[in-house]
Amino acid sequence: PPKCVNSLHFHNTAEVFFVLSGKWRFFWGLNGDAGEVILQEGDIFNIPTRVFRGFENVGTDYGMIMAILGGDDSGGGVIWAPHVLETAQSHGLVLSESGILYNTKKGQVLPAGEQPMAKLSEAQLAAIPETPVSKVVPDYVARYWDMMALARNRPCPVIGEASLIKDKPGFEVEL
């Protein structure tokens, strides 16, 4: 729905977003202020690995995005920003080390031997890049109408070693 927000997190594998409908703002950085881009239907975003990212529906109607995690570990593991862990806990939500979310307000408890995900240390946080817009947008975003123009006579390679988005997320995309 409009104003639906996904909190800042990162994965250890690639995460590629396909905007199926609506208007979406993707933002990144520890506090979500390192950069942002607005994407619309048909656009593709291969957000860099190990970069905190979030997104929200900024359209006036329901929207849908599809996310694909790449590599050999399609679960990708999820790491929440420290302030996201704190906010979640204030609402009774606990993310376990294994990436499972428990709602303590609904009586859910972590199983024996399972621990809550620890906050990243200052040293760990300092090692996570605050990638600038000038790097992210040209290198990791493919706009629908650009892809359509390039696909007029043959398939347009979108994600791959010799594509618009030069990356190896564990799969390739052509339009």
What are these regions (language model features)?
Residues P1, S96-L175:
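A short, N-terminal "cap"/entry segment at the start of jelly-roll beta-barrel domains
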Residues P2-C4, N12-T13, V51-F52, D61:
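A generic "binding-loop/recognition-motif" signal
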Residues C4-S7, R25, D43-F45, T49-F55:
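Histidine-centered metal-chelating micro-motifs
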Residues N6-H11, W28, E36-I38, E56-N57:
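Short histidine-centered beta-strand/loop micro-motifs
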Residues F10-L30, I68-D72, L175:
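Short, conserved beta-strand element in jelly-roll/cupin
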Residues L30-T49:
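Short acidic-glycine-tyrosine-enriched beta hairpin
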Residues F52-P132:
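Double-stranded beta-helix
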